[in-house]
Amino acid sequence: MSLAVTLASTSKSRRALLAAAGVEADGVAPNVDEESFRNTMRANKLPVREQAMQLAELKAMRVSAKRPGLVIGGDQMLALGDEAFDKPADLEAAKNHLRQLSGKSHTLETAIVICEDGAPIWRHLARPKLTMRPLTEDFIETYVSSCGDALLSTVGAYQLEGPGAQLFTRIEGDYFSILGLPLLPLLDYLRIRKVLPT
């Protein structure tokens, strides 16, 4: 019998990526106060990539303590230098994100941790780098107005799989990781564990 796979998240995009790749996974909310946890990590001056990894691990551990099989926890944070960006709270914050990112390169610290029986057993960190073209104020206003609240579900206030592709001049790294899930290394691990055929 194959191991059960659970995604410690209610993220529709992560579940859709798994399903499209042939991985059946239940989605379970990890019930983590992410804002408080992030604030503590930032107060301790942890690097952004370490913040993403610790939050991914916490999510997976919380759900794994209650669910059998493999539990996948993920987190993605945007790093502009040493500054971490969270998902924008509203459309005005989305505009501010885009103003700050305009004409610069940033990294999406995309962490994934798998836990089994409440303990972490596998980790992966992908660090795609994206370079945004210089954006005019008119473009930012029009872009945010046309995309609307969908931008509030992403750390950079863009969705690369849609009109967000217009924002960039260069992308280095795995497309799936940009979408929030380092899918290819995850699939490799699931094959090792015989969740997927080899």
UniProtKB/Swiss-Prot annotation:
**GO-annotated molecular function:** nucleoside triphosphate diphosphatase activity
Query: What's this chain's function?
Result: Nucleoside triphosphate pyrophosphatase. May have a dual role in cell division arrest and in preventing the incorporation of modified nucleotides into cellular nucleic acids.
Q: Name one Pfam family in it.
A: Maf
Cross-referenced CDD domains, in alphabetical order? Maf (cd00555)
Q: Where is the active site?
A: D75 (proton acceptor)
List the EC numbers from the record: 3.6.1.9
Output the Gene Ontology cellular-component terms: cytoplasm
Q: Per the record's keyword annotation, is Hydrolase included, yes or no?
A: yes
Catalysed reaction(s)?
a ribonucleoside 5'-triphosphate + H2O = a ribonucleoside 5'-phosphate + diphosphate + H(+); a 2'-deoxyribonucleoside 5'-triphosphate + H2O = a 2'-deoxyribonucleoside 5'-phosphate + diphosphate + H(+)
The cofactor named in the record is: a divalent metal cation
Sorted keywords for this record are: Cytoplasm, Hydrolase, Nucleotide metabolism
Q: Where in the cell is it found?
A: Cytoplasm
The entry sums up its family as follows: Belongs to the Maf family.
Question: What are its GO biological-process terms?
Answer: nucleotide metabolic process
Q: What is this protein called?
A: Nucleoside triphosphate pyrophosphatase
Spell out the InterPro entries in the cross-references.
ITPase-like_fam, Maf-like
Organism domain of life: Bacteria
